[in-house]
Amino acid sequence: MRTALLSLLVMLSAVAALTSCVDDEEYANTPRGNFEALWRIIDEHYCFFDYKQKEYGLDWDEVRLRYVSRIDDTMNDDQLFEVLGAMLGELRDGHVNMYSSWDVARNWSWHEDYPSNISDSLIRRYLGTDYRIAASLCYRILDDNVGYVRCASFASEAGEGNLDEVMYYLAACRGLIIDVRDNGGGLITAAEKMAARFTNKRVLVGYMQHKTGRGRNDFSSMEPQYLNPSTGMRWQKRVVVLTNRSVYSAANEFVKYMKCCPQVTVVGDRTGGGAGMPFSSELPVGWSIRFSACPMYDADKQPTEFGIEPDHNVAMGKDDLQRGTDSIIEYARQLLGQ
């Protein structure tokens, strides 16, 4: 894990060096100046132009021509924010945001346009009232001796001691369900630390690149990502990971790692994606900009920006709430019972 973290830090340092160059360009704090600053920041540092051109025909030059006609130096900040936010929406990227004091421009279509495939009330029913909590993990043993771990976020890291306790408590179970549905991400190191409990050897899990220049295709060669086994207690039985469209960013990476581990099956819906390491800059008006700067790929060098397919595509049923059962959890239990 230290090797992957070192590579990540080196790449982020390179991105920081490049992004600082944005400040070398002086733009007036006018609607036109802010438009030009934003378009150029994205043009020189965003990492998915080629991929998204192939996926849905994104043409950043055409986007500029279309939106510059909407810029008028008499427009107010609300109007400018709306136009610039709409332009950023053309990237279809949940890691691309613009922050003002009154709003956040965002694109959440990666999960808003799809069924949620999760119910908080049903998850509470499976957890009951006597479940255990270790850092951000909620866990218990279900009636059929299957371990259930609810991991709703990687915003903070579970310590090695926390993970040891979870592994020890569930050790007698015949299988394990890890539910990361609606996990919007957080720390990649937290995702790595958890995934490291499910492999006994160093395994290639993917690749990363960083920008080496201002050209849209100025990238380093692909640098491998490896997952090293934890020195703590490791799980040796079958595992099912549950996913939906709201699995994003570091959680998307977790699913990527787990698909490379033995005895792991992914069940649910395609993940939301978010495979660009985000970085930040600022416009003359003072609004912060976040964007994807370092692309990440799976072990086959394929992009996961628009998500990872499950091994078994399962949706929640329309009558799940009425029956009090979660079709995705129940499918996982059946797999572990085979």
PLM features: what roles do these ranges have?
Residues 1-28:
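Bacterial Sec-dependent N-terminal signal peptides
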Residues 13, 168, 231-234:
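Structural motif
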Residues 20-210, 217-224, 238, 280, ...:
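Flexible, low-complexity junctional segments that flank or bridge functional domains
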Residues 189-323:
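Conserved acidic, small-residue-rich alpha-beta core segments centered on
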Residues 257, 329-331:
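Solvent-exposed alpha-helical segments and adjacent loops
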Residues 331-338:
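C-terminal alpha-helix
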